[in-house]
Amino acid sequence: MHKKVDWKVDRKTPSPTPRWAYLDGQVVPYRQASFGLLTHALNYGTGLFAGLRGYWNADERQLFVFRPEDHFRRFCESARLLRMELGVTPADLTAGLLELLRAEGYRENCYIRPLAFYGDESIGVRLHGLTPVVGMAAVRFGSYLGKEDGVHVAVSSWTRVSDNVIPARGKFAGSYVNSALAKTDAVLAGFDEALLLNDHGHVCEGSVENVFMLRHGVVVTPPVTDDVLEGFTRATVIQLLREDMGHTVIERSIDRTELYLADEVFLTGTGAEISPVTRADHRAIGDGRIGPIAAELRARYMETVSGRVARHRAWCRPVYAVTREREPMASGVAAVSERSVGST
């Protein structure tokens, strides 16, 4: 029997029903973005997706989307690997995203899911002779892993698919069965997240996150040639660690047992943001508490993505137009203030 979810009670689950969707260049009612059971991507996994976040800055009354052009650049590159000709540019998609968010009118953190998939109702495994569909939807969204005191991970028995099987450089719909198998096994065994190894036995990433460790004063993360996603949160974190925090960061392969001996471990991703790991395979990482570098990094990251760090402000795209108003003061002298338009 299907269990109905009470969305008013289930606070950790984002609302499944946005009001609007972006579909092939237009913002339409969400219910209009529906497809048949024989849709090619639904049957064969011939689609790709991206994940972006919007952060509400209450001080400025503004919603900022973090690095949208970079996300859409990778989105378009991934489409090429599936032989898709989308007919849109990263700039076009960014404009469509902003229009969608203005229609939704979110005044809180949200998550945006762009999709490109073969929408033909057709039987037969192939990538040629098909027409892609481009769509987006946005939902209210909080913490992905929901573990403020540290994440417990398990090294999965499932191996990460290699670049010669399904390229890790793209977020392809079908390849995430690999992640789902690992994630569910870990959660059912009492852990919060899974870590996957590649064919060479090296640590790749979490089910949907990149992984970093601190050992002997050096921050280490696997190279993109170890079958990991070229994540923009990963790139952001590397830059913050090096330029803002003054740490040495190197990219090299990581053995499983190195994690057990690490001083700190943390996961990064658009959804997961900065998620410190405090236990791996029932072993404490460091002293079993969130380490100082991960704690500082998490704070800096949240300030950055919400548009509060001037030097990285260019990464944050404001959604709502800002107008300047003149407000009377008690002294009779007018003062200029700013407010966001379209955010009601």
Q: Predicted regions span which residues?
A:
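Short secondary-structure junctions
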Residues: A103-C110, M245-H247
